Amino acid sequence: VGNLLISSLALEKNGYDIFRKYPALFKASYAMLKYSFPNLTVSAFGDTGRASQSAESLEIGLLGAVKYNQAELPEMLASMKKLIDGGIYDRKKSGFLGLLCYMPEIPEAKTNYQWPRTGTLEFARFFLQRNGTDPKTGLMVGVQGATYNHNHCNGMAMELYGLGEVLGI
């Protein structure tokens, strides 16, 4: 998704309304945080590695949200604040892409990020439930069981989060 978003950024900068034409691509720029454990990492979905919300993707999405006056802008700003406050992202290290393409300043988030207590990633058949969002005291369970999405040969995968760690898979 990251490379598609970078390509979309180039097209947007040259007058093509890619995010308006393909709203799912815009939504992909900020989707991962809502599936994250309280330590800001995402489920391994069976056999993949652990990732987190891409700050680069979120920066590109913020450009689209501002340009098209999207209702998601406050949530996206709160997501970016969460990544910066959590030590996941430092804008000073965004390189040439950040220097040449990102907004000069990120507008101040007026709200904190609101973690959904429960959620579903439908295509992956991933279901989550949280109890608290503090990285040390929060709890979360994620269960995934799609037949085509990185699952183990033994069927369903479950991850438990507590005490700041993913405790099982």
Q: Where is each model-derived feature located?
A:
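Extended polysaccharide-engagement surfaces of secreted carbohydrate-active enzymes
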Residues: G2-I169
